[in-house]
UniProtKB/Swiss-Prot annotation:
PROSITE patterns: ALPHA_CA_2, FN3, TYR_PHOSPHATASE_1, TYR_PHOSPHATASE_2, TYR_PHOSPHATASE_PTP. Its main location: membrane. The gene is Ptprg. This is Receptor-type tyrosine-protein phosphatase gamma. The record marks 1348 as: Ancestral active site. Monomer; active form. Homodimer; inactive form. Interacts with CNTN3, CNTN4, CNTN5 and CNTN6. It catalyses: O-phospho-L-tyrosyl-[protein] + H2O = L-tyrosyl-[protein] + phosphate. The lineage of its organism: Eukaryota, Metazoa, Chordata, Craniata, Vertebrata. It comes from Mus musculus.
């Protein structure tokens, strides 16, 4: 600290200060980016588009410089006269006799498993692989459907359809495109040859209930969240996605609604919508796209992906001639053309606002009528304008009849005043439209004002590149609401006025001085107020009183909200506001908590701005005069006006001139706005009017060119002080304060840096080069003793050990404390906590995950090494980078290319109570195999966790970095595969790793003596990319076993998937939380995840994965660890039979968990369809949708893909068994089709009821006659018998299934078993049949089909005991609970009685006893209990199980 007092520091300080002042004085108009004229920007934009066109890959978007108004530059057809979409006016549509019933062929069939969905970046498309044909409806022939596309709005059911009817737009529009297969072989060929194609438009309308027909689509959307993602869809029926009645439709000739906009489309627009719930709508709003501006790519939400509506021109819209179809509820449809929201507004906003000077003292305002009129006719227009002069604000509103020219002349214009104009349409009953664009005019300079930004049309916004894993986050600025606020200068400046629908107006809290400076009023900055954070309700009394005690000042940062909040098309201006207001209505009503969270976010943002450069420190804070004392408004930063009563506020505590100490003192609130207002208009003499600061210092952006017609601030840039204005005569008045402020700011920065350097130096000395360990939040009993001790206090940034090369960082990394309210949750309360998160459509999970997404937004963590040109090829994905501060550094290789040989895309990640517990990395590339194995050797890694398959959905996710057999050499590392063990959901490989450069006993060898080590790879094989596993239990088993394999002398556990973020982060969180549960009986998922997000980007990639973590942990808490070694099983069984405090045994509690499964696992809607009900013997034993065995559907027949059968997980494969019912006479062929489709070669028949009729009991053909199943025939070729030890017999049939079209043959063996399990036989005989089946299965492929009469307990028991016996053989342990629960999850209704569950335990005890005692003497009873001769203690005997 003494160095700060040395003269050289002060000399340096004075030089820097003088340089800053010289820069500010000499270049006051410089901004972050070049701001040119409108003509220049349009020219640049056109050049960029022409370049893309020349390259053969024209880029287009739904907004910005490549938005719809620019499509014509790259696709000339987009400027044609017959473009789509259009607004269809029902009363103008004529009935066409040629438009009769629509004929659909194949639409009633379920789609095949080849149908797939893709996120194209512009929409979500379904590629249809089945035959769907459309004819009729005036189409010139029989057309084949090839693809389906969707268009949607911003959020919460806002308008998103491309077409509209009578001005009514819907949340989603689905479009089905088809072509003539007689002329072309594909849809794309028809477009390229400019031939006629067809399209259907189907509207989706919000309904209170889920539409089950959409479930496969919604499930598919979750698999294509990110750009270019693809997924196969579950079977669906395309007809179910259409309206119930197809008779009412409109017809017109139009174009494609996307480039190339070819005018070749025969449109069929259905009048009736299809229902969709808000919950299902959310899947559309979660889709991401990649936006591109020049060479910069950014990941944004894909929203508002619709083209603006086009003019009808000379075209005619026709209606179908199916008259009865138009009668039903048409009146209701027309009376309310836009539903609940549109019924409140007169029309869309007036468009094409212009302000032009007529002479020195007069202006002319002109506009065009709204594109859509919801409640015609328009009676008149209201022109409102406001102006300022000599710090006094004037305002005037007048009306103009709609039948006259849409122009207004404003006389007596002063060149020294600022004028703001906007127009509103008025219909009958004083129903009004939304306001038009707000135009700002001063001294021949016109600006378009949208929302809270001044924008220049046609200029692309260059967004910073981000990852597909991170959604853009809106940071809410302080806001307040007012009921009926007048249309004052403030409401104009924020682009918001009184709501035209009579609802509460939403007004941005402040218009800061940057806006006013650019217009000649003062210096400062303008805040961005994303629509997603504007409340539409007044705060509650309690919330307002909490918020009233502090002053919140305006910030200078404009943040881009997710989705296009600045529309390029004028017709969308009001829609953005309307959609934002709709979104607010779905927000949580817990007002206090929302305001507190916004308040904290605002504080963090404002504190961070205190350290900005001098370019942003040219703002002053004028203190209010003593004659104007004020109170603060809730979170708004507004000062109340003397004499005006403030509702819902606490008594004032702040003194005049007081500034909150924790906020930026350099920010100026230029306008003072009352938190409440009356319906009366303000007058110039009203003492309650907002006051302007008496002095108007200019910012750097206080000059503008007289030649500029439009001046813009790029909303994607952070500095919004780039608006240009005239110089002010009071320029020198703020230079002295600026010097003082700059000096103080610089001193504070130097002191802060010195403190940080000192603090980090102390930590290095204390920790001897290792980071401090994370501390945990104490349990509830410890909190009183530990005080305010919190979990994961800071993010750890690492000091590498001596074996790693050191790189001097370019900048210091900030230390991020975890929020104070992040406390661990006791496990007893975790179930209740999850219930709260699931409530309100999983709103709690969404809030938590948004907080996770924001936690690193302001940290400025660098990843320069990943972006270095020499390292970019080492990254599997361009947007998944390794943070510099926590990256794993390899020892540099000798040679000329050694400079960047220390890089690998991997980061250290902390675990529970252990720093650097994991290494999170990407799936290795072939070019990085050597680096990967070097890292494993140097880090002494003994466990590899792999959570991806090499290829998924046809895409390479990871390259195989281990030898398939024998040995492979990767640089200096030789890897040998020692063994492979395959389990149902994961595979364990034991690898030997040897370093040829390390000799035994060499000093550089971390282990000191060995040059060979063993590395175990745990490879989970059932985890879908960007998704989650179907069931949590197998994942828990995988995590527990891989975690238990780690030895104390091993280095970090290496975890990777494909990108090394989503599935990798999920594993790390589950593993760490399981350790915390074991150690402290507490859980802190949110706090821990926010902590590790500072160490590798985007760990836990999706909200779905975040929810899965909670589900898995809850499963672990409820079920506990149930795997038991064979030697402990007897004592374990006795312990779970002891009644607890409530009188219930743990066995009863386990069985309750088995039978009470989560509702999402037991959905059985396919089995409950009317066409399938007759195929079920017992409606209570049907397949769950997640594990249902599907059949290849037969063409033209509905429901032919259904059979009452379920996959069951075994020990070696996830679909090792299929449990089904005894075939019914009319489902016998379905049974054999299932065998054929799934290549099953073993059938085990367990008859529960011997009273079945002969024709029903025997479902196979006789030897004399084959059974014909169309695609194949079934022939019995032999029959044999196998005697068991109890003299019972198994009848064995051998069948051959031969294809009728080719030479394929499938051999099937059928075991017709006696009564099993036999209650009259010893329990040990139970495994005799199982051993026969197991031995046969070793030589056969495909699943084993097991059936009893209903496909219930007997079949389930055989699968359970087979799996458990295999587990006992391989692991010398069993997990009865997990096996039984998995069977009940995959086929609900198998285990329904606790005695069935007890029998599984008895059988396993018998098997273990048999193995331990050899074939010693056994005594059996008829109830199935077994006693060995040596057993004498009744408490320890299996008799106690009865």
């Amino acid at each position: 600290m003494r160095r700060l007092l040395e003269p050289c520091w002060w000399i340096l300080f004075l030089k820097i200060t003088s340089s800053v002042l010289h820069y500010v004085v000499c270049f006051p108009a410089l901004t972050e980016g070049y701001v040119g004229t409108l003509q220049e920007s349009r020219q640049d934009s056109s050049v960029q588009i022409r370049r893309r066109k020349a390259s053969g890959d024209p880029y287009w978007a739904y907004s910005g410089a490549y938005g719809p108004e620019h499509w014509v530059t790259s696709s000339v057809s987009c400027g044609g006269s017959h473009q789509s979409p259009i607004d269809i006016l029902d009363h103008h549509a004529r009935v066409g006799d040629e438009y009769q019933e629509l004929q659909l062929d194949g639409f009633d069939n379920e789609s095949s498993n080849k149908t797939w969905m893709k996120n194209t970046g512009k929409t979500v498309a379904i590629l249809l692989k089945d035959d769907y044909f459309v004819s009729g409806a005036g189409l010139p022939g029989r057309f084949k459907a090839e693809k389906v596309e969707f268009h949607w709005g911003h959020s919460n059911g806002s308008a998103g359809s491309e077409h509209s009817v009578n001005g009514r737009r819907f949340p989603v529009e689905m479009q089905i495109f088809f072509y003539n297969p007689d002329d072309f072989d594909s849809f794309q060929t028809a477009i390229s040859e400019n031939r006629i194609i067809g399209a259907m438009a189907i509207f989706f309308q919000v309904s209170p209930r889920d539409n089950s027909a959409l479930d496969p689509i919604i499930h598919g959307l979750k698999g294509v969240v990110h750009h270019e993602k693809e997924t196969f869809l579950d079977p669906f029926i395309l007809r179910d996605l259409l309206p119930a009645s197809l008779g009412s439709y409109y017809r017109y000739t139009g174009s494609l609604t996307t480039p190339p906009c070819s005018e070749i489309v025969e449109w069929i627009v259905f009048r009736r919508p299809v229902p969709i719930s808000y919950h299902q709508l959310e899947a559309f709003y979660s889709i991401f796209t990649t936006e591109q501006q020049d060479h910069v790519k950014s990941v944004e939400y894909l929203r508002n992906n619709f083209r603006p509506q086009q003019a009808l021109n000379d075209r005619v819209v026709s209606k179908s001639a199916v008259r009865d179809a138009w009668n039903h509820d048409l009146a209701d449809f027309l009376d309310n053309p836009l539903g609940t929201e549109a019924s409140k507004v007169c029309s869309s906003p007036p468009i094409h606002m212009k302000v032009q000077p007529l002479n020195q003292t007069a202006l002319q305002v002109s506009w065009s009528q709204p594109e859509t009129i919801y409640h015609p006719p328009i009676m008149n227009y209201m022109i409102s304008y406001s102006w300022t002069k000599n710090e006094d604000e004037k305002e005037k509103t007048f009306t103009k009849d709609s039948d006259k020219d849409l122009k207004a002349t404003i006389s007596h214009v002063s060149p020294d005043s600022l004028y703001l104009f906007r127009v509103q349409a008025v219909c009958r009953n004083d129903m009004r439209s939304d306001f038009s664009q707000t135009m700002l005019f001063q001294a021949n300079t016109t600006r378009i004002f949208q929302g809270t930004r001044i924008v220049k049309t046609g200029v692309p916004t260059a967004s910073p590149a981000s990852s597909a894993d991170m959604a853009p986050i809106s940071s809410g600025s302080s806001t307040w609401t007012s009921s009926g606020i007048p249309f004052s200068f403030v409401s104009m400046a924020t682009g918001m006025g009184p709501s035209s629908s009579g609802s509460q107006a939403t007004v941005a809290s402040v218009v800061t001085s940057t806006l006013l400076a650019g217009l000649g009023f003062g210096g400062g900055g303008i805040s961005s107020f994303p629509s997603t954070v504007w409340p539409t309700r007044l705060p509650t009394a309690s919330a307002a009183s909490k918020q009233a005690g502090r002053t919140v000042l305006a910030t200078t940062e404009a943040l881009a909200s997710p989705g296009p909040d600045v529309h390029s098309a004028p017709s969308k201006d009001s829609e953005g506001t309307e959609e934002g207001e709709k979104e607010e209505k779905s927000e949580s009503e817990d007002g206090e908590r929302e305001h507190e969270e916004e308040e904290k976010d605002s504080e963090k943002k404002e504190k961070s701005e205190a350290t900005h450069t001098a370019a942003e420190s040219d703002r002053t804070a004028p203190a209010p005069t003593p004659s104007s004392p004020h109170r603060t408004a809730a979170e708004g930063g507004h000062q109340t006006i003397p004499g005006r009563r403030q509702d819902h506020s606490a008594p004032a505590t702040d003194q005049p001139g007081h500034v909150a100490p924790d906020l930026d003192p350099l920010v100026d609130t230029a306008t003072q706005v009352p938190p409440t207002a009356t319906e009366e208009h303000y007058s110039g003499s009203d003492p309650r009017r907002p006051e302007m600061p008496s002095k108007k210092p200019m910012s750097r952006g206080d000059r503008f060119s007289e030649d500029s017609k439009f001046i813009t601030v790029n909303p994607a840039e952070k500095n919004t002080s780039g608006m240009l204005s005239r110089p002010s005569p009071g320029r020198m008045e703020w230079i002295i304060p600026l010097i003082v402020v700059s000096a103080l700011t610089f001193v504070c920065l130097v002191l802060l840096i010195a403190v940080l350097v000192y603090w980090r130096g102390c930590n290095k000395i204390k920790s001897k080069g290792f980071p401090r360990r994370s501390r945990e939040v104490p349990s509830s009993g410890e909190r009183g003793e530990k005080g305010s001790r919190k979990c994961f206090q800071t993010a750890h940034f690492y000091v590498e050990d001596s074996s790693s090369p050191r790189v001097v960082p370019n900048e210091s990394v900030p230390i991020i404390p975890i929020p104070d309210d992040m406390e661990a949750i006791p496990v007893k309360q975790f179930g209740k906590h999850i219930g709260e998160l699931y409530s309100n459509s999983q709103h709690g999970f969404s809030e938590d995950f948004e907080e996770v997404q924001r936690c690193t937004a302001d940290m400025n963590i660098t990843a320069e090494h990943s972006n270095h040109p020499d390292n970019k090829h080492k990254n599997r994905y361009i947007n998944i980078l390794a943070y510099d501060h926590s990256r794993v550094k390899l020892r540099p290789l000798p040679g000329k290319d050694s400079k960047h040989s220390d890089y690998i895309n991997a980061n250290y990640v902390d675990g529970y109570n252990k720093a650097k517990a994991y290494i999170a990395t990407q799936g290795p590339l072939k070019s990085t195999f050597e680096d990967f194995w070097r890292m494993i050797w140097e880090q002494n890694t003994g466990i590899i966790i792999m959570i991806t398959n090499l290829v998924e959905k046809g895409r390479r996710k990871c390259d195989q970095y281990w030898p398939t057999e024998n040995t492979e050499e990767y640089g200096n590392i030789i890897v040998t595969l020692k063994s492979t063990k395959v389990h149902a959901c994961y595979t364990v490989r034991r690898l030997s790793v040897r370093n040829t450069k390390v000799k035994k006993g060499q000093k550089g060898n971390p282990k000191g003596r060995q040059n060979e080590r063993t590395v175990i790879q745990y490879h989970y094989t059932q985890w879908p990319d960007m998704g989650v596993p179907e069931y949590a239990l197998p994942v828990l088993t995988f995590v527990r076993r891989s975690s238990a394999a780690r030895m104390p002398d091993m280095g970090p556990v290496l975890v990777h998937c494909s990108a090394g973020v989503g599935r990798t982060g999920t594993y790390i969180v589950i593993d760490s939380m399981l350790q915390q549960i074991k150690d402290k009986s507490t859980v802190n998922v949110l706090g821990f995840l926010k902590h590790i997000r500072t160490q590798r980007n985007y760990l836990v990639q999706t909200e779905e994965q975040y929810i899965f973590i909670h589900d898995a942990l809850l499963e672990a808490i409820l079920g506990k660890e149930t795997a038991v070694s064979s030697s402990q099983l007897h004592s374990y069984v006795n312990s779970i039979l002891i009644p607890g405090v409530g009188g219930k045994t743990r066995l009863e509690k386990q069985f309750k968990l088995i039978t009470q499964c989560n509702a999402k696992y037991v959905e059985c809607f396919s089995a409950q369809k009317e066409c399938n009900k007759e195929k079920n013997r017992n409606s209570s034993v049907v397949p769950a949708e997640r594990a249902r065995v599907g059949l290849a559907p037969l063409p033209g027949m509905k429901g032919t893909d259904y059979i009452n059968a379920s996959y069951i997980m075994g020990y070696y494969r996830s679909n090792e068994f299929i449990i089904t019912q005894h075939p019914l006479p009319h489902t016998t062929k379905d049974f054999w089709r299932m065998i054929w489709d799934h290549n099953a070669q073993i059938i085990v028949m367990l008859p529960d009821n011997q009273s079945l009729a002969e024709d029903e009991f025997v479902y196979w053909p006789s030897r004399e006659e084959s059974m014909n199943c169309e695609a194949f025939t079934v022939t019995l070729i032999s029959k044999d018998r196998l005697c068991l030890s109890n003299e019972e017999q198994i009848i064995i049939h051998d069948f051959i299934l031969e294809a009728t079209q080719d030479d394929y043959v499938l051999e099937v063996r059928h075991f017709q078993c006696p009564k099993w399990p036999n209650p009259d036989a010893p329990i040990s005989s139970t495994f005799e049949l199982i051993n026969v089946i197991k031995e046969e299965a070793l030589t056969r492929d495909g699943p084993t089909i097991v059936h009893d009469e209903y496909g219930a307990v007997s079949a389930g028991m055989l699968c359970a005991l087979t799996t458990l016996s295999q587990q006992l053989e391989n692991e010398n342990a069993v997990d009865v609970f997990q096996v039984a629960k998995m069977i009940n999850l995959m086929r609900p209704g198998v285990f329904t009685d606790i005695e069935q569950y007890q029998f599984v335990y008895k059988a396993m005890l018998s098997l273990i006893s048999t193995k331990e005692n050899g074939n010693g003497p056994m005594t059996g009873d008829k109830n199935g209990a077994v006693l060995t001769a040596e057993e004498s203690d009744p408490a320890e005997s299996m008799e106690s199980l009865v």
